[in-house]
Amino acid sequence: GFNFLDVGGENYDKNMSGRFYELADEMRLVHEHLPRAFLAAVLFLPLPASRDKGKRSSFAHMVVELRERTNPADPSLPRVPGKCDMGWVALYAEGDEPEGFPRGVVRFFNAARDCPRSGRPKVLETESLSEMAAAIVEAARRQIKPNYVAS
């Protein structure tokens, strides 16, 4: 999912509720047909979303909301069909940020972690695409392995 600057130009979380309703519907539908499927959600925000508001940025709001819609990592706990198994918020550079990042640079933040209330996370607190993919695969292996029964 993507979120853009609202019409008033103040923040990036204007239609966040709609994105999460869509996410829950997708998760529920897939889990209904494939109950053991491991589903990861990735929501994209431009880098200015990390500093668009004073108290809590749109990025921080997105991380907290996505965390609440993610199943616990413990495979012994029951999974909720309308939740994803892992959530990530991607921050991407549009190319005109004061930090000077080139257009298209993307870093992925695991929603299970705490993030700054305002401002971007440190690069070391984020993952590249390949690091995120490896983390998703590893989490899926941990989730599926205890429940796998060979026939």
Question: What is the role of each PLM region?
Answer:
Residues 1-6, 23:
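Conserved catalytic cores of phosphodiester-cleaving nucleases, focusing on short active-site segments
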Residues 1-2, 39, 129, 144:
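Generic low-polarity alpha-helical segments
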Residues 6-9, 99-101:
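Short acidic/His/Gly/Ser-rich catalytic and metal-binding motifs that mark active-site loops
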Residues 9-92:
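Acidic, metal/cofactor-coordinating or nucleic-acid-engaging core segments within structured domains
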Residues 51, 59-151:
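C-terminal tail/extension regions appended to the core domain(s) of diverse proteins
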